[in-house]
Amino acid sequence: MLRCTVYSSDVRTAAFPLDCKKINFQPPQIQEFKLSTFNASATGVYLITVTPFKDNGDLDLASTDKMVDFCLESGVTGLTILGIMGEATKLTAEESRLYVKQVLSRVQGKVPVVVGASAPGFAPMSELTKSVMDMGADGVMVAPPSTVRTDDQICGYFDMVNETLGPDVPWVLQDHPVSTTVQMSTSVVLKILKNSPRCVMLKHEDWPGLGKLTAICQAMAKGELKKTSILTGNGGGLFLPEELVRGANGAMTGFAYPEMMVDVCRAFAAGEVERAFDIFDAYLPLAKYEQQQGIGLAVRKHILAQRGVIASSAIRKPGPKLSALDIADIERLTRRQEQKLRDLT
């Protein structure tokens, strides 16, 4: 059975570099487990995966298997599928179920699998959640719809999410204003977490959001908030080292080089903080390029295809296409990244 590295960060009381003693945080301790668990203690890297398509737009289930193997070999501690970068809104309900079934079949319980379940209404959310949980998914992820604007509307919406999902489904609160256009203040996030017994994880990707992250971690440290796993996003973890310093438990995002996030989290957990920053810096130019609004997914899929992870870089229509100049940029950044990584060894 594949062995996965799991990072346990139950205690944040000892000091470590970068003045973290001021906020009572310490890097997580590494432990080895055969299986990681999706709960409030989850740590490490939950990779947001792409959805592979054939050139004609059909689901590519063979590439799906290959992609899952690649993710597991990279050392991720979990997978999150049918997220924003997974083109979930371009799949039919039947395709979504087929894709989830394929991923779960390939993973075989080696790491937790979380499924994006955000929907315009609660009926499709309930239907998809029941379906994927019956298949063996470990939980679902929910983001607020663009129709909620006030604090009361946002909190009321998630009260209904709790009613819809019920007491047996653990779920992730996704805070990503760039995609949802919904700005959830720190106080709103805290209220949702306090009112949601089965919300075990916050996918924090507000930007700028380091202050919000610190406030939420401090609320937990003071006992004002139940223990909640906090994994961060922002495509390729653009602020991952800083977020780990502030108390994040790891990352839940996507990048064509998931081993970067795994290596950064491992180095940080081992107390090698400067090395974690050095590893991150080597990948940052390409991560930044991949984070571009509009073409970011095309960049990621192009690189994954070049790495042999998926057979085609196809994005289901409507979607962006890379120009020859875009591809030249990627090739240059990749060469420079390879040299920087050689210099690190």
Regions found by a protein language model. Give the residues of each.
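C-terminal alpha-helical cap/extension of soluble enzyme domains
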Residues: 46-51, 74, 248, 256-345
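Catalytic alpha/beta core domains of metabolic enzymes, predominantly
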Residues: 177-284, 290-292
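Short helix-capping segments at alpha-helix termini
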Residues: 105-111, 135-136, 165-169, 195-198, ...
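Active-site beta->alpha loop and helix N-cap motifs at the rims of alpha/beta catalytic domains
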Residues: 38-181
